[in-house]
């Protein structure tokens, strides 16, 4: 039975499986000195999708904070789909290998990633800004101003 059928596609359970798998390798006599995540974990697209993000609601905006260590702004794309879905995507590439150099340990995740967030109705999709500084992407979506309350309308009564 494969691991996906046991755990579904829950990233937390899948990551736990990889950690336990690495631990099993160390306790079964495998002398690979593998105390970190396996190469399969590093390359797993679902692991990339598990990129941590915080979402804050401020009085005038929504702020999305996503860890993007090692990425340049050109590697990151921020888009709005279907008028209310914020999409943050990108690709993290591994450095080109130099002749005679090999990885002894590989833990940083490589590959494509994508995070989607459903925006609330009061999000102004025409006023979105994004900045990546020190490996942290901050996307700010301004809120639409609250609708003005309807004023009472006076109807003139005519006498017949």
UniProtKB/Swiss-Prot annotation:
- Give the signal peptide as a residue range, or say none if absent: none
Q: Does the keyword rRNA-binding apply?
A: no
* Protein keywords: Cytoplasm, Stress response
Q: What is its main location?
A: cytoplasm
Name where it's found.
Answer: Cytoplasm
What Gene Ontology cellular component terms go with this record? cytoplasm
Please name the InterPro entries in this protein's record: A-crystallin/Hsp20_dom, HSP20-like_chaperone, Small_HSP
Q: Which SUPFAM superfamilies match?
A: HSP20-like chaperones
Q: Which residues form the sHSP domain?
A: 44-160
- Family from the record: Belongs to the small heat shock protein (HSP20) family.
Name of the protein in question: 17.9 kDa class II heat shock protein
> Which organism's genome codes for this protein?
Helianthus annuus
Lineage of this protein's species?
Eukaryota, Viridiplantae, Streptophyta, Embryophyta, Tracheophyta
């Amino acid at each position: 039975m494969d691991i996906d059928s046991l755990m579904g596609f829950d990233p937390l359970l899948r990551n736990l499986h990889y950690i336990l798998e690495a631990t099993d390798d160390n306790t079964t006599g495998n002398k690979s000195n593998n105390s970190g995540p396996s190469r399969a974990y590093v390359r797993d697209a679902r692991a990339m999708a598990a990129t941590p993000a915080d979402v804050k609601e401020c009085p005038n905006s929504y702020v999305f904070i996503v860890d993007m260590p090692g990425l340049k702004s050109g590697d990151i794309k921020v888009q709005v789909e279907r008028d209310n879905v914020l999409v943050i995507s990108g690709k993290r590439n591994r450095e080109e290998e130099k002749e005679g150099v090999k990885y002894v340990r590989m833990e940083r995740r490589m590959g494509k990633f994508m995070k989607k967030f459903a925006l609330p109705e009061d999000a102004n999709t025409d006023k979105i800004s994004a900045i990546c500084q020190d490996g942290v992407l901050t996307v700010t979506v301004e809120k639409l101003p609250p609708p003005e309350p309807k004023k009472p309308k006076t109807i003139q009564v005519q006498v017949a």
